[in-house]
Amino acid sequence: MHPGINGPKFKDKPAIIMAGSGDIITHQELNELSNQGAQLFRSLGLKPGDSLAFMMENHKLFFPIAFAAYRSGLKYTAISWRLQASEVEYIVKDCGAKVFITSKFLEESAKSLANSLQGVHKFMLDGITDDFKSYEEQINKMPTTPIEDECQGAAMLYSSGTTGKPKGVSREINLNPLPYKAEEDDLGLTRVVQGLYSADENSIYLSPAPLYHSAPMGFNTGFLALGATSIILEKFDAENALAAIEKYKITHSQWVPTMFIRFLKSDPEILNKYDLSSHQIAIHAAAPCPIEVKEKMIDWWGPIIHEYYAGTEFNGFVACNSEQWLSHKGTVGQSLLGPIHILDDKQNEVPVGEEGTIYFEGPTANGFSYHNDKEKTKGATS
């Protein structure tokens, strides 16, 4: 559900806990902070359909900013802080951002971008530099009540650019008043985490990956929308992750194969040091997981490991649980959103066992397009 419901409903229950610092944002604070952000964006003249970009480390205000943009009907783009300044500049300009938010942690990057982002409202968390105003100071001037014209925004994340310039994955903005009924809400991956992974308001979700990636951003948003609690690691560390599972009684988590590998390379004393009994669902994706690595993880954690295959476009979703994987080792599961086709360069189906390009069949490819690139959109949705 929406922060406007969860705030009054769950009040002082933690929505976000930063595992390293211990900083907490409650559901009511998430509601109020996102209202203040939305009020700020409207005061700057941003209207539904406009764009905002933000680049920061795993920061406690990452999701209050994302929810503020969502409540404002904006397209919001989270950018990797590991990119070069020229790459960041390209994305900010390509997405048409009218607001750019970063943090003091990335001060050097901010300084190098200041002159190239003329005409863009620039804000910084935890301090100021050059042409960047304090985001916290600005929102503190704003009311904590909702803006009058709330409507549903959408994330517009950029692909990795492995086949050229990064491409923004865009979806249409729904200009209708924002729904406050759970069955109408389409916030993040709420339905996925609820339906496929049995998440609810009592879930406690561990997020160890960079938040600017589509999966951590979407899954955290989904859990928060249910009224759950997200425990966010500032950065991944094998022992710190295990300690967090014990300390916060984690029920759900999400990983990538390199994290599994780093777990398994750790001292056995560390692996057996922590109580992991609360852990019910461990989700992984992002890259192929070596069979022997997954076998060892299931031996260690038990049959709680779930895998999926999808993309930022979310035009397809394939998933399997541990039992299904053990009976078909190497699989990523069955499609949940329609048939899959493996085609050759001439768009012909290839026989089982042969390589080809993966195509998901579905209604208008789930409504996505590549921002400013009709040809690539046409090529990806034929």
Task: Please provide the spans of the model-predicted regions.
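AMP-dependent adenylate-forming
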Residues: 2-26, 127
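Hydrophobic alpha-helical segments in the ANL/AMP-binding
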Residues: 4-5, 42, 60-79, 88-89, ...
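Conserved AMP-binding/adenylate-forming core of the ANL superfamily
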Residues: 15-59, 84-89
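ANL superfamily adenylate-forming
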Residues: 20, 108-157, 165, 171-190, ...
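Short beta-strand->loop structural element characteristic of the AMP-binding/adenylate-forming
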Residues: 53-55, 62, 66, 70-101, ...
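Gly/Ser/Thr-rich phosphate-binding loop
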Residues: 155-157, 161, 225, 250-255, ...
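Conserved AMP-binding/adenylation subdomain of ANL enzymes
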Residues: 178-208, 212-252, 266
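Conserved ATP/PPi-binding loop(s) of AMP-dependent carboxylate-activating enzymes
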Residues: 335, 348-380
